[in-house]
Amino acid sequence: MLNKFFKKTKYITVSQRALGDIHDDFTKKPSIPNGMWVKCDGCGKVLYKNDMEKNNKVCYHCGYHFRMNALERLELILDKESFYEFDKDITAANPIEFKGYEDKIKNMQNKTNIKEAVITGKGTIGREEAVVCIMDSNFMMGSMGSVVGEKITRAVEKSIELKLPLIIFTTSGGARMQEGIFSLMQMAKVSGAISRLNEEGLLYLSVLTDPTTGGVTASFAMIGDIILAEPGALIGFAGKRVIEQTIKQKLPEGFQKAEFLLQHGFIDNIVSRENLKETLRKILVIHGRGN
């Protein structure tokens, strides 16, 4: 009789293995794919990479401009399907037989999906036609070798032939050491071609992007009729430490940044990436009316 009132309560039993699975669910780290997040060098905040790339590779917190490759910039600036590429199959030789140079070039071509550190061609920007050269710092730091110099020189000559304005987007670590003196020759060659462009009364727009240094700065980057720069771009010839060691003086903070150069009259304006295409279009329109 008493057993009816004092029945033993039955409980659900959980095996030790199941308990272990529950514990693992709470303690194991979440699986996040590599490359999904990037840290902004400007403000230090962590950004969702897809959102940053949709924002033209600009930080949506502080406006820091991440580096763009040549194909990305081509898509940003040129009208869709308007670009016709020049000399796309020219590749580097090894004029001083630098060990491993050919392999390095092949690796860079596979990695970047371009043949050299510059893309040249003609296209339209807001329906305004121009010859365009876009350098790429992902290809051997945008270093200027014989092919880069040759492609830009040919683009300048094509600009003269077609009577079109020239726009060069620069980004470079300077001369390409693997080509020795042949690399340094390109500074004079490109500058000479641009001098002929000036004699024809044609417009040359130089757009300095991060970083523009070395022989490129010392030659064609700084001789544009109009010189624009992206915000925060590093622009200079030698590095800060080299200069300080040479002149034995402490240099001002940020003296090689675009903002410092604008303040001291070395460039004409700083244009954010979102406004760059429209700014270039307006300049081309004004130039066209002037002619």
UniProtKB/Swiss-Prot annotation:
Belongs to the AccD/PCCB family. Its cofactor is Zn(2+). The lineage of its organism: Bacteria, Bacillati, Bacillota, Clostridia, Eubacteriales. The keyword Metal-binding applies. Keywords: ATP-binding, Cytoplasm, Fatty acid biosynthesis, Fatty acid metabolism, Lipid biosynthesis, Lipid metabolism, Metal-binding, Nucleotide-binding, Transferase, Zinc, Zinc-finger. Pathway: Lipid metabolism; malonyl-CoA biosynthesis; malonyl-CoA from acetyl-CoA: step 1/1. Acetyl-CoA carboxylase is a heterohexamer composed of biotin carboxyl carrier protein (AccB), biotin carboxylase (AccC) and two subunits each of ACCase subunit alpha (AccA) and ACCase subunit beta (AccD). A zinc finger (C4-type) spans 40-62. Binds 1 zinc ion per subunit. Its EC number is 2.1.3.15. Pfam families: Carboxyl_trans, Zn_ribbon_ACC. InterPro entries: AcCoA_carboxyl_beta, Acetyl_CoA_COase_Trfase_b_su, ClpP/crotonase-like_dom_sf, COA_CT_N, Znf-ACC. It is an enzyme of class 2 (transferase). The gene is accD. Residues 36-291 form the CoA carboxyltransferase N-terminal domain. One of its GO terms (molecular function) is acetyl-CoA carboxylase activity. It is found in: Cytoplasm. Signal peptide: none annotated. This is Acetyl-coenzyme A carboxylase carboxyl transferase subunit beta. Zn(2+) binds at C40, C43, C59, C62. Its main location: cytoplasm.
